[in-house]
Regions:
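Extended alpha-helical scaffolding segments
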Residues: 1-136, 160, 165-537
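Short functional micro-motifs and their immediate structural scaffolds
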Residues: 155-158
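Flanking scaffold residues of small Cys/His-coordinated metal-binding clusters
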Residues: 142-145
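Short Cys/His-rich metal-coordination motifs, predominantly Zn2+-binding knuckles/fingers
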Residues: 150-153, 272
Length: 537
């Protein structure tokens, strides 16, 4: 093994957390060999973990999914029943393509172009490879003034760059016919940047890898990872298109070259334009996101066009539960969304009794918000949610409707307590808009953990109306308690109140009146009698 060339199959570069909570750096081969001993990937960013997970999945697809499966769930179940991954088959594949996994190579460097050169002969600092956006929940930018990074770090950020790189003008590459004036003009962000990425997570990394390995799909022999393709050049590949998830997992949106210094670290880089992707037509290929019907794109192409569904970082994941777990497409009342295939696959496994029907599916989502023209980083965020596996099934329409209604009632209750906060501020002579926003945020915060717990406990096989009624009562009590706190803190000015004239109409705002409005709205939004809990079939 030539360590100076750094083969990612056998050299450690992937950050993981073991079952005891310790972080380790492992090679690709060791990860597959010991996946059952690792809890999860533990890279610098959730988006980095997502990008690396997809590379690992590309390997597994090529090992186990070389042709259509006659009995997809049964064949998958045979692998699931093992305590570890079938390492012999995996190693055989890795050894076959070993020469394509050298990070530094004169002819075929991993995910790079060996002779990539800028038209001006210059290179860029290596920190261009690393996002300069705030980490969710953190105070500092990811990017620092790196003079160099280790090959292991470079390998991680190389995978991230292909998946998520920002758009904007790139360095013009010699041999790229699209270059004008030494510049590569924008061709869009990396493919994963379009996605509200979804990962089904297991109790360890072995389970996570398998749960995201969808055997029930049409196999296309052209669907191969980039390391099985001819070595990349600086030029755009002619007529390049994805033929399945494997190609998308390793799509070369950029042409990249890492430059080593005398110590063997990476100190300079080139990032140039690669292959653009037809982002409007990937719903039959991409398996790790949900989909939304795009009216503008459908009008443009004269057919239904589904675009990757993205997540709103300002909202908790459960507030969009109707899009995350849509009802069947055959239901014309809700054909605006299509389910995420990896979530649906878990439901298929449960319906075929490969997984328990009581299994709680846990998902982790990853999203990126870009700046203007997608030419800068804004935010990278993630969220988690757990629910009964059967909620992803097309057969669970009635249960889904109950969950939708539960989320809607929670959201409306938060909005109602927000209006209470605004009305109390008006009564006290304060800023109603600011107070309303703060109270609404408090409402959502108060309901967040309880809703997640309720959803994890929700069972489609039990009485959904009883479960909805219990949740509605819980929301009522939590929001009523929050309202009591707001009223107690409103101050004497609010109790006295004031008259406010708007549009030639005068209304008296006071604590007492605000409470009356609040109570009326809350009772209307949260019906608690048994007759009003019923969900239509």
């Amino acid at each position: 093994m030539n360590e100076s060339r750094f083969n990612v199959i056998d050299q450690p570069w992937i950050l993981v957390k073991d079952v005891d909570g310790a972080q380790k750096t492992v090679s690709m081969r060791e990860l597959f060999q010991r996946a059952h001993q690792f809890e999860c990937l533990a890279g610098e960013l959730p988006s980095q973990d997502f990008a690396i997970l997809r590379i690992l999945l590309a390997v597994l697809y090529r090992v186990f999914d070389a042709e259509n499966h006659d009995s997809p769930t049964e064949e998958w179940g045979e692998i699931w029943e093992r305590s570890d991954l079938p390492v012999d088959e995996i190693s055989e594949y890795l050894d076959k393509w070993y020469d394509r996994f050298y990070l530094f190579d004169d002819a075929r460097p991993w995910l790079q172009v060996a002779d990539l050169e800028s038209t001006g002969g210059s290179t860029k600092p290596v920190d261009l490879l690393i996002p300069d956006c705030p980490i969710e929940g953190g105070l500092f930018s990811m990017r620092r003034d790196y003079e160099s990074i280790t090959p292991a770090e470079a390998a991680r950020w190389l995978a991230h760059c292909h998946a998520y790189d920002i758009s904007g003008i790139k360095t013009g590459a010699v041999g790229d016919g699209r270059v004008k004036g030494g510049k590569g003009y924008p061709i869009g962000i990396g493919w994963a940047g379009w996605l509200g990425g979804i990962v089904v997570t297991g109790s360890n990394l072995r389970e996570t890898l398998l749960l995201n390995l969808v055997f029930a799909r049409e196999h296309d022999e052209r669907d191969v990872p980039i390391w099985e393709e001819p070595p990349l050049t600086s030029a755009q590949r002619e007529d390049a298109q994805a033929h399945g998830p494997v190609a998308l997992f390793t799509w070369p949106q950029r042409r990249i070259r890492l430059f080593q210094n005398s110590a063997g670290d990476v100190s300079e880089i080139l990032i140039c334009n690669g292959d653009p992707i037809a982002y409007q037509f990937q719903d039959s290929n991409e398996v790790m996101c949900g989909w939304r019907l795009s009216a503008p794109q459908s009008k443009k192409f004269g057919q239904d066009v589904y675009m990757p569904r993205q997540f709103d970082p300002s909202e908790t994941l459960w507030r969009g539960i109707n899009a995350l777990l849509p009802t069947s497409k055959a239901d014309s009342s809700n054909n605006d969304f299509k389910n995420c295939p990896v979530i649906e696959w878990s439901a298929d496994l449960a319906l075929d009794d490969i997984l328990p029907r009581t299994q709680i599916t846990k998902i982790k989502t990853v999203g990126v918000v870009y700046g203007p023209q997608s030419a800068s980083w804004d935010e990278i965020f993630s969220d988690e949610l757990a629910f009964n596996v059967l909620l992803a099934s097309s057969e669970s329409t009635r249960a889904k409707e109950a969950v939708y209604l539960a989320a809607e009632r929670a959201a409306e209750a938060a909005r109602i307590v927000g209006r209470l906060g605004g009305n109390l501020a008006t009564a006290a002579g304060g800023d109603p808009e600011s107070a309303s926003g703060k109270a609404r945020s408090l409402g959502f915060s108060e309901l967040d953990a309880p809703f997640r717990n309720w959803l994890a406990d929700f069972s489609p096989s039990e009485d959904v109306n009883e479960q909805l009624a219990a949740w509605t009562s819980k929301v009522y009590q939590l929001i009523r308690d929050l309202a009591t706190q707001l009223v107690e803190n409103a101050g004497p000015e609010a109790w006295v109140g004031r008259s406010v004239t708007q549009n030639n109409t005068t209304r008296v705002y006071s604590t007492g009146q605000a409470e009356v409005w609040f109570q009326h709205a809350l009772q209307k939004a949260l019906p608690r009698s048994s007759k009003t809990q019923e969900v239509n079939a």
